[in-house]
Structure formats: C-alpha cells, structure tokens
C-alpha cells in the first residue's frame, strides 16, 4: 500500500493557464477560492434552481429543487470534512498525511463537489436519463454490435452499422453506439465542467465529482474488485483523453476514485434520504403521523437504546411534547435531521479514517455508509419508505411518465438534424441556414451557441480525410443533441415540448 500523502492528491494545477512555481499555504487556498467562484457563478449551478429533486414541475417553493438540495449536501459535506480533519488532528495524523497545510483546500474541494454533484442531471431526473437512453437504443441497437452475422445489425445509422472487413472501424462503431446509449448525469457533469462550460477547474476539484469510474462505452462484466465504483458510467468517449490526464495528475490507477469523492457521496446519501420524506409531507402524500408509523413498521422490533429509538422515536416524542410555536411537522423534521446528522456524520467520518489506505488508493469498493451497521440500516429505512410510499405514489408516477414523454418527444422533434448526411449537416453548420432544409435550419437555430461551438471545436480537430471521421462526426452530432436537451430545466423542456407540438394555448 502506497504511503498516504494528500499533497500528491490535492493537485492545485489546472488544464489551461495553470499557476506555476511552489505556492504557500495561502496561495494554494486562493487557487481553490477561485474554483469556488467559477463554480458558484456558473450557469450550470443557476439552472439547478429550476430542476426539481423528486417532484417535477413543482411550483411550491417549499419543496426542494436540485439547487436547494445541493446546498444541503454542501453543508453536510463540510460537516463530514471538518469531523474527519478534527479526528485526524486529535490523532496527530494531519502532518503525517500531508494535510497540515491543506485543511482549507480539503474542505473546499468537498463542499464544491457536493454543490456540483447534480449539475449533469437532465430534466425530470432519472426518467429523463431513461428517455434519452431508450430513444438512442431504439435507433443504434448497441446489443446488435456484438452479434453475428453482421446482417443481423438493426442500427438505423448507416455510418455506425458494422461492415465486413472493417474490424478496426467496427470496434469504434461498437464503442460509439454503446457510449451514446449510456447517458448518465454524473458523466454529463464531467462533460459540462470540462468541455461545455470550460471552467478550467483544478485537477483535484474535478476529481471530486468523478463519482463512477466506468467509461460509458464499457461492454461486458465489471471487475469484482471495482463493481461498486463502476456500477454506472462516469465519463464519455468525448472526455476519454481528459480523464486519462486527470488520472495521471491525481495519481489514480485505472478505474479508481479520488479520495474526497467518498465524502461527497456520503453527504448526498444523508441529505436526500430525510429531504425526500420531508418533501412528501409538504406535498401531502402522507402526514407526519403516517410517516412515523411507516418508519416504525419498516424498522420492526427494537430495543430502547437502538438507533431507531435514539433518532426517529426521539424526534417524534420531542415534536409532540415541545412547546415551541412551530408545527408538529417542522419540529419533527428538525429533530429528525439533527438526530440523523449527529449519528451518521461521525460514523461516516470514522469509516473514512478506518479505511483510509484503500480510500487514498481509490480502491475502496463501497460507500462509506454501506455496511452491516445500524447507521447503514437507518439510511436503508429512509430509502425503502420513500420507494414504497413516495416514488410509487400515483401523482409522482404520472409526472415521471409525462417527463419521459417530454424528453422522448423533444428528441423526436430534433431527429431531422441526425438524419442529414455528413455533407449536408456540415453545410448547415457553416451557413446556419440552407434553403433546401427549412425545418433543419430552424431546428439548428434553436440549439444553444455554447453547444454548437463545442460540436464545431470537436469536429474541427479531426482530420477530415480520416476513415474514422464520419463516425466521430456523427458521434459529436448526437452529443450536441444530448447536451442541448439535457441542459434544459424541467419547465423549459415542458414549455418547449408544448410549443413545438403546437399545443401552446
């Protein structure tokens, strides 16, 4: 096991215009303050205020948006980070681990990773992801790329269909088709930060949001040693070279994770479990009394000093006996949140310290709050009650189905841009309006300038006489469409769909 030295992980250099020379503690902290400014002032963060956490198109300001959720995650992440550093200080480990002058950057990286953790999520959350992936699967059929004979290939895109005698190109076709059918919010977050927003963050800060280490084009089984770290796609083919450089700069082995990402993940797990239940009460899906009984029933028999008793029962009893001039709902969730944090944050911090050799190496193949402990059981309790009584509620399911239809419908509306030949689309990009393509011209005008420029830059770097050029061009054209639609807010996607389907009143 390599020696633990966080100076080798908290890399304050950047991809472009990186600070040079040896820096003092204060100068390094200023570099990460610059990261904070770039992140907080970015449009991607502002858009989170119109993407909802559980209830799409929610107009009740008391119900969480992705932004308010991310701010809560940021605070919990800060709490865990401070707890870790405090315990390390007591154990006289800060200097031994190279953290004595990096406590500020340590906290800042965790906080900003928490704030950014949802920036790549499309409208309507997981149903938006599913809509994008299903739409592309129905056209690219990545599973057919593994089949024989080649005549069985149902891919509707001629350039990406497998061909006899073109095995090197066929392998690229397989990768592209697999990649495009595995849109994922975390991978899109990496793409946003580096390619679309060009935020030029420090290597360490980007490492903090690389939650999953599996490439989106991965085919086959994942290694047992990394099955948790690779359970979802973490980055796309378009960012392959950037991630390779990131691994080098952060001393990460293949498919390994940056150490501080475990803290961000734990903060998210703690935050959303309680928040989803509180939002459900706000939405009148159930009362706080009904929620308590759901929790009690799901936990089952327990002793007086059990974690359930100390956290949930304690919150319930205090909320009913407290004389504060606050509603029972407000008091219950205040105590539930405080009790949960006071138990789970120290536990997560200690798990981080206890497993630091594997975490520092990036190979710890679990979440911090995923084990056989009561703390893990408490999180599972919150999640299971939410799945059973919130996510399966008819109102929630109807909104999710509507969201799926909106995203699928928008992709179908913009499909003519993907149907153009390479030469025709190139002409449209250069001229922006082509008389013989009136529909395609108008659709192209609706795409954001940022996304169009990202496409142009990516394609312009490719040698046009390359045999792979048509494949890569089509790949980046698909990315252009995914970038545009996934970057919409819930309400914008809903309104755009209604306008283009001519149902706007």
Swiss-Prot record:
EC number(s) from the headed UniProt entry: 3.1.5.1
Record domain HD: where: 66-273
A single MF term (Gene Ontology): magnesium ion binding
Top-level taxon of the source organism: Bacteria
InterPro entries: dGTP_triP_hydro_central_sf (IPR023293), dGTPase (IPR006261), dGTPase-like (IPR050135), dNTPase_1 (IPR020779), HD/PDEase_dom (IPR003607), HD_domain (IPR006674)
Keyword Manganese: no
PROSITE patterns noted in UniProt: HD
Alphabetical GO biological process terms: dGTP catabolic process
Cofactor: Mg(2+)
UniProt xrefs under SMART domains: HDc
Keyword vocabulary terms for this entry: Hydrolase, Magnesium
Family: Belongs to the dGTPase family. Type 1 subfamily.
HAMAP family, alphabetized: dGTPase_type1
PANTHER family: DEOXYGUANOSINETRIPHOSPHATE TRIPHOSPHOHYDROLASE (PTHR11373:SF32), DEOXYNUCLEOSIDE TRIPHOSPHATE TRIPHOSPHOHYDROLASE (PTHR11373)
Subunit structure: Homotetramer.
Function (record text): dGTPase preferentially hydrolyzes dGTP over the other canonical NTPs.
This protein's name: Deoxyguanosinetriphosphate triphosphohydrolase
Source organism per UniProt: Shigella boydii serotype 18 (strain CDC 3083-94 / BS512)
